[in-house]
């Protein structure tokens, strides 16, 4: 199925696979599972509540939260209400939050799962705040009350390719955070390109979302890719439960920055020292058993596509994981190009490179040897 916009994808799965699990959200007291039908009702009610707040069409609504089911529901509700999302990194300080709220001209903010909201709250003074009680965020407006008090929106607007969908602020590694304006069309094109390039063979694919959804790689590679595939989204409860939560999920696609791969490698070698691992992998009868046990422990037993990016990774480390049947594909992209750039792909992986241009991408070098990227 070829979709034309994020809401087209969501409403398709909501209608055609309503009982498919959409979210598995762990809490300290237990996990909450939400189907596409149940999520749709909640999203539509929040969208109706946002419309009732009577902001001008295409107003900016900020989103301050760590990854969780409510992050994605809020994103879809903002789209359904005809507004534009402004995700904010959940770890930045109050001054930076205030700057982004002002610069983006955001009218309101949805506040969800955070480590220390009290230290950030002053950055939201003067703005309408919607708190999510499930994450102990108490504000004048409460998400759960809005769900209880509103009817579900029935008329979902059609999204046009040229419509502004979101303003994504860069992490600031190249200076002050810059607000990158992405349209419905740019999100749709890159997601459809990724779906065509990365063949996930699973009837109900599973995804594990832990890198910030405010980052373009997670926003496209997990949220949008998973949404277009009609998959389920799983999240870690905390850093302490990360390994167990990932192992319980066994996702079909996984993305990690190089420092995560180093942690995985250290964890494996702590359990099986290198000399012992070399010996076990050299024994034909045992090596496949060892590989499967390691992959299952990591949560990568069923993973069909594994990616890394955002920083360099050594060829020696890629080769080390390859011996364990973990084929890590390096990719390259920017917030500014909506990560539609260069990818190694499963079965076409060349270590020491970031792969070939994706379909529709053109590349050249400037006289100063800058990489210039253009896409449709």
Over which residues does each language-model region extend?
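Conserved AMP-binding A3 loop
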Residues: 33-37, 165-191
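Conserved AMP-binding/adenylate-forming
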Residues: 254, 290-376
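Conserved pre-ATP/AMP-binding loop-to-beta segment of ANL
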Residues: 18-21, 150-169, 176, 200-206
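Structural core segment of the AMP-binding/adenylate-forming
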Residues: 53, 76, 80-145
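Conserved AMP-binding/adenylation subdomain of ANL enzymes
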Residues: 188-206, 213-293, 302, 327
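Conserved AMP-binding/adenylate-forming core of the ANL superfamily
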Residues: 22-68, 72-76, 93-98, 102, ...
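A short helix-loop-beta submotif of the ANL/AMP-binding
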Residues: 60, 66-86, 90-94, 102-108, ...
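ANL superfamily adenylate-forming
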Residues: 115-161, 268-297
